[in-house]
Amino acid sequence: MQIYLVGGAVRDTLLGLPVTERDYVVVGSEAQTLLDLGYQPVGRDFPVFLHPQTKEEYALARIERKQGKGYTGFACYAAPDVTLEQDLLRRDLTINAIAQDQDGQLYDPYGGISDLNNRVLRHISPAFSEDPLRVLRVARFAARFHHLGFYIAPETLALMRKLSRSGELNHLTPERIWKEIEKVLSGRNPQIFFEILHDCEALNVLLPEVDALFGIPARPDWHPEVDTGIHVMMALREASQRSEQLAVRFATLCHDLGKAQTPAHILPSHHGHGERGTPLIRELCKRLKVPNDCRDLAILVSELHSLVHTALQLRPATMLKLFDRLDVWRKPERLSQLLLCCQADFYGRQGFAEREYPEPEYVQQAYDAAVAVAVKPIVEAGYTGEAIRLQLSRRRIFAIRDVHCRWNDK
């Protein structure tokens, strides 16, 4: 029995990155041997075991053959006669097919070290196109390692495009798609993931609402980049630099979905796009089973981001309605989330990096003034029932008006 460290742990060590988990492949053994040694079986579809002490994963070397649709349509053969090279051959990319034995010796039958040094994401064999999930995985690796200069080999991108056109992506479950999106939105440079999916024609299958934004024109004075899809990618990059919150990044991705449905006769203006985006967000989130907090913030940002951009022109009563719609009195974190998305939207435009954007500061000050209005004096003044709410709203409007006047006097 021979044991090798494989996959991400070897790759990340060679890249000088921290290793968070270790996976091993076991060659020349069988399931009963591992069971006798106290390993715990955890793989339902594949022979995977947990080490009795470290709880790290150990998998028997195996061969996979395509026999059905989707990423689960594989027959697995695991036996003592499966070699290390055969096991590594089934993996997606050369950089993930490097093994290391217990003495530290590296095994690299498919040129992974060379591709690591040259910053190339390259598939190992034509069998790459048998697994539709690999389209998402490669795009995610491209995003994850973008800061290191990695790019996808042209022949691999061509296979990804072929796979996207084959219909295989339709067999991915909503849960699996969201899991990949969640991973990429939680990491570095998430915009790269969506740009690559657009380039390889997978985005129109997986997230047609986002893909539809590419090619939609916007006013060049407000969006010098013109293309709405490009703007959303720029905004997502900004959001990822300003916040690690999944909900903020997802809401930024979805904030302009309504622009794809702007009537042609009013283009390149997009009046009402926030409201048009709401049903699209609901449908997307229902289809992919997106968590409720991500869905709810995305809807609010779609509806309200244009109001924040014009906050200094809003009447105090309208500003209070914005706060009420956010339910900031019970969920104050929503305001900071909305403002982060609006900042990403504003600065996610060509040539806007040095522009002033005072509106978020004004909105925050207006909220601080409104939330400071106390209920106790209203009750002590003799108001009851609905009259308390009306008087509270009235006093909050006055507080917002004071802030508005101070800003106008600047």
From Swiss-Prot:
Domain text: Comprises two domains: an N-terminal domain containing the nucleotidyltransferase activity and a C-terminal HD domain associated with both phosphodiesterase and phosphatase activities.
Highest taxon in the source lineage: Bacteria
Residues of the HD domain: 228-329
Binding site for CTP: G8, R11, R91, R137, R140
Underlying gene: cca
Entry's EC annotation: 2.7.7.72, 3.1.3.-, 3.1.4.-
Cofactors named for this entry: Mg(2+); Ni(2+)
Family of the protein in this entry: Belongs to the tRNA nucleotidyltransferase/poly(A) polymerase family. Bacterial CCA-adding enzyme type 1 subfamily.
General function of this protein: Catalyzes the addition and repair of the essential 3'-terminal CCA sequence in tRNAs without using a nucleic acid template. Adds these three nucleotides in the order of C, C, and A to the tRNA nucleotide-73, using CTP and ATP as substrates and producing inorganic pyrophosphate. tRNA 3'-terminal CCA addition is required both for tRNA processing and repair. Also involved in tRNA surveillance by mediating tandem CCA addition to generate a CCACCA at the 3' terminus of unstable tRNAs. While stable tRNAs receive only 3'-terminal CCA, unstable tRNAs are marked with CCACCA and rapidly degraded.
Keyword Zinc attached: no
Name of the protein in question: Multifunctional CCA protein
GO BP term, pick one: tRNA 3'-terminal CCA addition
Keyword check for tRNA processing: yes
Binding-site residues, ATP: G8, R11, R91, R137, R140
UniProt remark on cofactor binding: Magnesium is required for nucleotidyltransferase activity. Nickel for phosphatase activity.
Example GO molecular function: magnesium ion binding
Reactions catalysed, as given in the entry: a tRNA precursor + 2 CTP + ATP = a tRNA with a 3' CCA end + 3 diphosphate; a tRNA with a 3' CCA end + 2 CTP + ATP = a tRNA with a 3' CCACCA end + 3 diphosphate
Subunit composition and interactions: Monomer. Can also form homodimers and oligomers.
CDD domains assigned to the protein according to its UniProt record, in alphabetical order: HDc
Binding residues for Mg(2+): E21, D23
